[in-house]
Amino acid sequence: GQIPINPETGNIVEGGIYEQTEQVMKNLEGILTEAGYTFDNVVKSTCLLSDMANFSAMNEVYGKRFSQNPPARAAFAVRTLPKEVLVEIEMIAAK
């Protein structure tokens, strides 16, 4: 999974759930692109949130990356995430 670390600085991005989710999605996009995939190839994702109250905001940012057919997804609130971030997302892609 990816947490909101800026790969250039190695630091957690500042801000709230919108900013953190945006960074996570940028990280995932970079990984997908490097492997020859796009978000259209994602078949399953799992979203981990430190607080389920952030689901709607996370979902707003997440949803911008998918066209007609979003992948299967599970979302969970967890007690803690690495480095006390607000969100972590993992994806499985296939061609």
Language-model segments: which ranges?
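Short, polar/acidic, helix-capping and beta-turn segments at strand->helix junctions
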Residues: 2-95
